[in-house]
From Swiss-Prot:
It comes from Erwinia tasmaniensis (strain DSM 17950 / CFBP 7177 / CIP 109463 / NCPPB 4357 / Et1/99). NCBIfam families: PRK04966.1. It holds the Pfam family UPF0270. It comes from the Bacteria. Belongs to the UPF0270 family. This is UPF0270 protein ETA_31870.
Length: 72
């Protein structure tokens, strides 16, 4: 189920995004990015609709995933 992220408290949304970013592991790119930069990137992707915030009833967890990978 897609969670309407705009309806979440901003602090809750920030916590969910930070948790997601920290789970994603280490960047191996040329330049390391700060947590704040990564959070801003995910927030931008949510705003553009590129990614969605998803609740999994099976796993009882929240995840952020590309819109194209989400299946009802």
């Amino acid at each position: 189920m897609i969670i309407p992220w705009k309806e979440l408290d901003p602090a809750t949304l920030d916590s969910l995004i930070e948790s997601f970013v920290l789970r994603e592991g280490t960047d191996y790119g040329e330049h390391e990015r700060s947590l704040e930069q990564k959070v801003a990137d995910v927030r931008r992707q949510l705003s553009s609709g590129e990614v969605v915030l998803v609740w999994s009833e099976l796993h009882e967890s929240v995840n952020i995933m590309p819109r194209g990978q989400f299946h009802d």
